[in-house]
Design a protein with these regions (language model features):
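Conserved donor-binding/catalytic core segment of Leloir-type glycosyltransferases
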Residues: 24-42, 48-51
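Carbohydrate-associated surface elements
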Residues: 12
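Aromatic "clamp/platform" in nucleotide-sugar-dependent glycosyltransferases that forms part
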Residues: 114
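Short hydrophobic beta-strand element within catalytic cores of glycosyltransferases
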Residues: 131-134
Length: 210
């Protein structure tokens, strides 16, 4: 296929729903991550390992996981092995509005996936205006640009180090998060994306008009 016949149009992010909420205070030490499926591909193990290392110096640290663990499964056993049950909270069956509230409550978002398609949690975290740590894989750097802490996949040390950096200098990373929200609004607006599809469809019709 010729490159002139390839068009890339991203998905959009609902930046009105996922937004900073002045009436919702951030909970000190709260970190949020999404594990829509309890599978290794989500890289949750590495975030859990980082939390286990941090809890000594940051005993108030709390990881909110949007998703569910399999009863008696690998993740549940790992949490028990690391002795971090008190630092982990699972939230399941949430509406989009409730997920947006969890983001607004949090100080840091982590996407530790080993692979992602578009990566909606990345864009939703950025739209929420909170500092983001994300793996430098697949489409993630295309979404984040320079507005997130990009780290290697499968690297709990990098997650740990990034969390310490953010908790140690909130103003610096909050400023970048604020710019990250602007980046999402400018580049992942559903209205602009719909206009891109409209223009592309019109062009195709014109090109193939008999």
């Amino acid at each position: 296929v010729s490159s002139k016949n390839i068009f890339v149009i991203p998905n959009g992010i609902d930046f009105q729903k996922f937004s900073p909420k002045k009436n919702i205070p951030r909970i000190p030490g709260q970190i949020i991550t999404t594990a829509s499926a309890d599978v290794p591909l989500k890289g949750l193990d590495f975030t859990l390992e980082a939390v286990s290392k941090l809890k000594k110096d940051f005993p108030y640290i709390r990881l909110v996981i949007i998703g569910a663990a399999r009863a008696g499964g690998h993740t549940e056993r790992l949490i028990q092995k690391l002795k971090i049950e008190a630092n982990i909270v699972y939230k399941t069956n949430l509406t989009k509005e409730e997920i947006a509230t969890e983001y607004a409550n949090s100080n840091i978002a982590i996407v530790s996936s080993l692979y992602e398609g578009f990566g909606f949690p990345v864009g939703e975290a950025m739209a929420s205006g909170i500092p983001l740590i994300a793996t430098n894989v697949a489409s993630i750097p295309e979404i984040t640009s320079t507005f997130a802490e990009l780290i290697p996949a499968s690297d709990s040390k990098s997650i740990e180090r990034s969390i310490i950096n953010i908790l140690s200098n909130p103003p610096k990373y909050q400023s970048r998060a604020d710019e990250g929200r602007k980046h999402i609004i400018e580049n992942f607006d559903w209205y602009k994306i719909s206009k891109s599809y409209e223009a592309l469809i019109y062009r195709i019709i014109q090109d193939f008009k008999c």
